[in-house]
């Protein structure tokens, strides 16, 4: 059984709200979230081609959706340390990860990684980096990655280009949250903003070879999957708090009914974006 290590790198007992508090009680809904396209983890496997094994650090692992995808692609020669500060998420991750996968789930945060210096070939975060203090996270990435090691950040979002259903779904959120606009992300301190991960990494002297890729995944889903998947998004939870839960739920039911086919399925497209960079080998540059 995958291990869950509760060793804390932050004060969980603090009463000050933390960005990960938003995920309390949402672990159950994550089983309805879409899988990450296998091509994303496969890209990382190819990029790690110079090594035959090693250590992967994942930050903000949630319920382990991306963790398991990476573990499957890389195989047993890579040990994955999956850090997740929300206890409910860690519990679901450990329970859903097959026995024998070389994964350890631990309490930990992006800004203070409980990882030895220069110990990892890959540091990754999936659907989480927008909640980090990224300047501190990038400093930690430089510290924990070996020379030539890979920093990879993945974002997964509804793809509204050419999809009336995805457009209507995002419009429900925009109508409930005046400061939210599609393609914006939650900020750690609250509110929403657009982020440019590629641009941020290109501005750092400690990383080079910044690349961006995108994979669009289309999926036919039924009403139950759609509703539970919607409830797994903190942005939907905030929309229900800002307006009225029953009103938001009624809107979601309505757009599903409007777009469902004869089999009571809707096409929900998602885009997975991956941005990668390599830690500079200063010895080679000098």
List each language-model region with its residue ranges.
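Conserved class I S-adenosyl-L-methionine
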Residues: 2-51
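Conserved Class I S-adenosyl-L-methionine
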Residues: 3, 190-286
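Class I SAM-dependent methyltransferase SAM/SAH-binding core
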Residues: 55-59, 63-112
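Helix-to-beta-strand junctions that scaffold the AdoMet/dcAdoMet cofactor pocket
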Residues: 75, 132-133, 145-146
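A short acidic, Gly/Pro-enriched loop at the edge of an enzyme's catalytic core
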Residues: 111-122
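Short catalytic micro-motifs in class I SAM-dependent methyltransferases
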Residues: 127
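A short, conserved alpha-helix within the catalytic core of class I
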Residues: 132-140
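Conserved catalytic/acceptor-binding region of the Class I
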Residues: 142, 146-219
């Amino acid at each position: 059984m995958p291990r869950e290590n509760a060793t804390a790198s932050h004060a969980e007992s603090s009463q000050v709200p933390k960005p990960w508090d938003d995920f309390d009680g949402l672990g159950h809904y994550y089983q309805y979230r879409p899988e990450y396209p296998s091509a994303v983890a496969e890209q990382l496997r190819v990029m790690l081609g110079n090594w035959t094994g090693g250590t992967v650090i994942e930050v903000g692992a949630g319920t382990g959706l991306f963790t398991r995808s990476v573990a499957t692609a890389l195989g047993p020669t890579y040990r994955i340390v999956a850090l997740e500060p929300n206890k409910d998420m860690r519990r679901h991750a450990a329970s859903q990860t097959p026995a024998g996968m070389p994964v350890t789930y631990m309490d930990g945060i992006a800004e203070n990684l409980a990882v030895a210096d220069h110990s990892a070939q890959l540091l990754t975060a999936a659907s989480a980096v927008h909640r980090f203090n990224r300047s501190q996270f990038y400093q930690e990435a430089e510290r924990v990655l070996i020379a030539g090691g890979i920093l990879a950040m993945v974002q997964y979002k509804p793809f509204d280009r050419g999809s009336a259903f995805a457009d209507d779904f995002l419009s429900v959120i925009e109508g409930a949250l005046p400061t939210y606009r599609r393609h914006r992300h939650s900020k750690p301190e609250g509110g929403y903003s657009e982020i440019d991960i590629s641009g941020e990494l290109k501005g750092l002297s400690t990383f080079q070879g910044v690349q961006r890729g995108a994979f669009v995944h289309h999926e036919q889903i039924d009403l139950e999957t759609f509703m539970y998947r919607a409830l797994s998004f903190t942005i939907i939870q905030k929309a229900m708090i800002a307006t009225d839960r029953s009103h938001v739920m009624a809107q979601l039911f309505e757009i599903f009914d409007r777009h469902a086919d004869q089999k009571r399925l809707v096409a929900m497209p998602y885009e997975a974006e991956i941005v990668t960079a390599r830690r500079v080998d200063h010895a080679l540059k000098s």
